[in-house]
Amino acid sequence: MRSAASRLHKGFSFAKRFQGCSDWICCDGAAWAGRWDAWAPGGTVRGKAFSHVVLDLGCGKGEYTVACAKLRPDVLFVGFDVDAVCTLRAAEAASAVGVDNAVFLMDGVPSFGDEVEAGISDSGAVSCGDSGNPSESKTLELADCPCSTATGARGDSPDASLTPVKCPEQAHASRASVRKGARSGAPAEIDLSTVFAVGELSALLMNFPTPFPKKKKAHLRLTYLDRLMGYRPLLGRGAGIRLRTDSQPLRDFSLTQLELAGYEITWRSDDVRVEFPDEPWSAYERKLTEQGACVFGIAACPGPAPEHVEQTAPLSLVSYLPDNLDRLDYVPHGMQGCVENLRNRNARERARGMQEFRPPVI
């Protein structure tokens, strides 16, 4: 899959673009841990604290994040995406409309060459943190929307004493992303446990995250067991996570992970748009729905912490595909090649009078 950087025009200057929207970018999230409710553009401190802090994990170009911020001026929306160019464009979107309750994380200043590093360093444009009425839309009311049921505050997490479970291979629990050699200059990873204090988040949103269908990349999914365990201490009392995706296999996989991580499902839907028609759109969601995608959704809150954490679910998303692939009206994003290969194989088996191939559960 091409990165955002690979699609940039020849004259694109990250440094110049960064300087124009740096007030909405935070390059040292750890400096704000425990006091995000006081953040203001440019890394200044606001007078009145935000009522909630919401993390949009995998925010892309920020259309959804900024739209939510416009609807809920009393809530701070913190966005993070693995691609620094997407983060830049999200900050530009926030700057363009002038919202003061949206900020986008970069784990340090990304490297795009000497021109970029020099431009950012000389400008000093790094938000590192020195010392209207809410919409009546059903979509974003934190009290009754599946986005969140949060009522807690910092330090009020039911799992405040938990140590995030680390993945044996990469120790990435609570890491937002892991990517090697990102051409876009994106950070290799970000450790959410250093960016947010215990119980600081009122909600954690995951909108159309990358599904990583292959078994060997399952640990990169935002709803992987180790990551879900890492989110628990960061969620305040009554807070939860919400997933929206076009992928039924990812939704079903996520249900297994939530159960293993001790979360309680508070809401699920096979068509989120029917239940929440006024919810903000992102360009990515519009693209998928125009292709025939239905939006699946889950909301969950941490329940009692499991005594023993063990991965027992099938990890390949192929294991969550329906038996009859010919009845699949929409193929989830990222699985088109796999489904086409399986359909072709089944067609050949039928032509030979043989039983159709069914991939093993792995």
Model-derived features: positions:
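Conserved S-adenosyl-L-methionine
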Residues: G58
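A short glycine-rich, Lys/Arg-flanked "PGG" loop and its adjoining helix->strand segment in the class I
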Residues: T223-R237
